[in-house]
Amino acid sequence: IDMETRRPGTSADRLIDNMVLESPLAAHPVVGYENHAGRTYLGEGVEGFGRVVSSCGHGNNDDDRVEGARYKNVFGTYSHGSLLPKNPVLCDFILQTALNHRYDGAEPLAPLDDTLELNAHRYMQERLSHNG
């Protein structure tokens, strides 16, 4: 994947924060947490995983609000921890994409009760939109 990560400064220059992203991979905003010292810049043909839309959060490099990377069926993000449990729609998309890649014409995933996960997602999205 055409991208470059540089690490300027020291550990004190880390980008650490919660964030909300808009991503073409999910119908709902994606909530996540980042903690990284690198500054990543995407090359030609590589798109962002999403764009930071909250007042908190830094993205790949603290310059352009782009977060993560997408290239073909590869997804990368600085969001970690509980990314997938807090974003069940994104999780379903990634699982379905993998199944479709492995099994041509894979059946759609059967819906699960995502009530708890969606509640966690809503809570974080509301918290981050009000507190920045």
Regions from the language model: what does each represent?
Residues 73-132:
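Acyltransferase
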Residues 1-67:
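Pocket-forming structural segment of enzyme catalytic cores
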Residues 68-72:
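Short, flexible turn/loop "capping" segments at secondary-structure junctions
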